Every structure is written in structure tokens, then in C-alpha cells.
Amino acid sequence: MKILITGGGTCEPIDSVRYITNFSTGRTAAFLADFFCAKKHEVTALMAENAQKPKNAKIITYRTFSDLQKILESECKIANYGAIIHAAAVSDYSVQEISVDGKIFPAGTISKIPSGKNIFLKMQENPKLLQKIKLWSGKQTKVVAFKLTSGATEEEQQNAVKKIFLAEKDFAPDFVVQNDKSEITATSHPCKIYKNSDKIIAETKTLQELAEALDGALWGAPIEGVGRNEVRP
């Protein structure tokens, strides 16, 4: 089966040396890519330039939101993927223009803003790529979305997942992987996998368990293991 996995974080340029980004390392996406390669799937990893890369997958890199959007649309339309795992940390906003001491410049057009200047950034909202994936690839493609919260209560986590399923409507993902930044450590990566807004099909503690659970969920196999074999209302 052909699988596309996105990972890492977008970089939105301010000038030639400054940009806005996030803390995503691409570690989860790289791990999943190598896991599915070992399962003999044909994996393409669409990764941020500075992200951790998988060892065995075909790699395509992106830098900005615009890069990711163009490449993702093209891959979805031409490559006939059976599954798309969208783990990239996509910026909600891009820099539209910069005001330097009252003078306006389009984002990314200044070589380097001198220090000591008063700078104001005008941001523009980026479209939600998750809403486009099934539109581009077809509803037959299995789509896995990721939702990271930070210091959220259980109710807040559930509401964040519910918002994804409701917002996408006819093009909703098949599964949402939810985790909370406050619970992630060097050795532990707790996740919940939702099949719809109120049904948890797996709870995992490590990336290995997450990969195995997604493998079972995507291909319809039973999900075995402690904490990963029950469907809760």
C-alpha cells in the first residue's frame, strides 16, 4: 500500500534570517515512516527541511506553509495513496507584511532587518490543509489527523478532537491521534486514537505502540494490547 506521511513544522519567513516556526521535530512522523517501510508499504515522507528524517522512506522536503500546501495537493492528486498520515505541525498564520519604522514590506523580501528598528508584523490566516486532503485524494483514502493540546483537561482534549471531526464534515479524517505536550517525555509519548468524536479505539504510551495501533486501525485488524483493545463510548 502507498502511504504518505507529513511531519515537522512549517517556517514562515519574516526576512532572510528570521522566521516564525514551532517546536515540532518530525520525530513521530519519521518513526511512523520507518515502521510502515518495515511492513513493506511504499512510504513517502513529506518532511520539513529541518525535521528528523526517516531512514528508508522516499523523502520530499518543504519549508513554508505554501510549499507544503502545493506539494501535498500534488501528491494527493497524482499518487493514489491508500493512507495519508498528516502529522505535520502546520502554522495557522503566515506573515503577510512587515512594518519597519513605518515602512511596509512584503514578508520575506527584506534581506535582514537592522537591529534597533520598531517592527510590526501583519499576519494572515492560512487555510486548513486537513479539510482539503480527502477532497484532493478522494474519499477512499484513509486519513489520519493529529491534534496536539498543551496542558489541557480531558474534557478540553475531547472537545479539540470533536472540533476536527465536525469542522471537516464530508471530508473528515478517518482517525484523529490526540496527545498533550505536557505528557510527552523522552521515553513516553501517550496518545489516544479516535475513530469519531466520542469513540476512542486505542490508547498508547510509546511511538511503537502508536505505530502498531495505527497499523491495525488502518487495515481493519484487531488492536491488541493493554489499554488498546476497548472501544469506549
Task: Say what each PLM segment does.
Residues 1-222, 233:
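A cross-family phosphate/adenosyl-ligand binding-site feature
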